[in-house]
Regions:
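C-terminal motif of bacterial Sec signal peptides marking the signal peptidase cleavage site
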Residues: 19-23
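Alpha-helical transmembrane segments
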Residues: 14-18
Length: 276
């Protein structure tokens, strides 16, 4: 498993800057704010949807059909990811009270339309769900010839928009961060993977293996040796890595030294050989 850490600190700075800017607008009328209201109502939790379309294979693609009664699968959740710092790449993760799921979308700067804390309602019927390298997600079916298997890749942003509605305004205070004290809590059974994949987590009392020595990544690199940095928990477990894109705005920052807490999206990678 791996965590993707990047967006928390950038978002805080953006909020502060917006507050300062707004304070300079005293001489102007405040424009009316149009608050979006979704028409569809959720009838399925994220956990229920993930279980209904789960397959144990590392890669697969399946269409989301209607329910036995003919109704659509409709979920809702709040956005927990952000690509503002160019570390999260072409995907959006949302959570509800039961779980989290990722949408693979072929677009940059998704944070401009889907802010952290924004609730979105998704009509999942007619979409495609599956796995790419072990991570369950929504996307577009593609055939992986080397592995002789189907998987899901990036869906078009237009297709994504046709299936979603914004509901209300972003509220980061309503996001739920799950606190973890040991990597051993990350169960890799099917049930455990459905629970943990794509979740927003805080891992307490961890340190980087190369803290104070290496940087988060290397410029524009995609090599695993460059972008993956080993994290060690309080029990000495080292089966979680922090993955930082070579395009991230903080790629050249030194890994912090000493123990601390880290917040990020918990992802998962599994090769066709079964290693992870």
């Amino acid at each position: 498993m791996k965590t993707v850490k990047s967006y928390i600190f950038g978002l805080t700075a953006a909020i502060a800057m917006s507050t300062v800017f707004a304070a300079c607008q005293d001489d102007f009328d405040t424009p009316a704010i149009e608050v979006p209201t979704a028409v569809n109502q959720a009838n399925t939790t994220i956990a229920e949807l993930k279980e209904a379309f789960w397959q144990d294979a590392s890669n697969y693609a399946d269409s989301v059909r209607t329910k036995p009664d003919g109704s659509h699968y409709i979920i809702k959740g709040r956005v927990i990811s952000s690509d503002e710092q160019s570390n999260v790449f072409k995907n959006i993760s949302i959570q509800d009270e039961t779980g989290a799921i990722t949408f693979s979308v072929n677009s940059y700067n998704l944070y401009l339309n889907y802010r952290r804390g924004q609730e979105i309602v998704i009509d999942a019927t007619g979409m495609y769900i599956g796995k790419y390298a072990g991570l369950q997600q929504f996307g577009t079916p593609s055939y992986y010839e080397n592995g002789s298997t189907w998987q899901v890749g990036f869906m078009s942003p237009q297709f994504f928009r046709r299936h979603l509605e914004l509901n209300g305004v972003p509220d980061v205070e309503k996001l739920d961060t799950i606190t973890v004290n040991s990597f051993s809590e990350f169960d890799t059974s099917a049930e455990g993977l459905r629970k943990w994949q794509s979740q927003l987590v805080r891992i307490n009392n961890v340190h980087f293996q190369d803290g104070g020595v290496k940087t988060f990544s290397e410029y524009h690199s995609s090599s695993n040796d460059d972008v993956n940095k080993t994290l060690i928990d309080s029990e000495g477990n080292s089966n979680v890595v922090v993955r930082t894109s070579g395009y991230a705005t903080f790629w050249n920052k030194k890994l912090p030294e000493g123990n601390g807490d880290i917040v990020g999206i918990l992802s998962f990678y599994q090769s066709l050989s079964g290693s992870s």
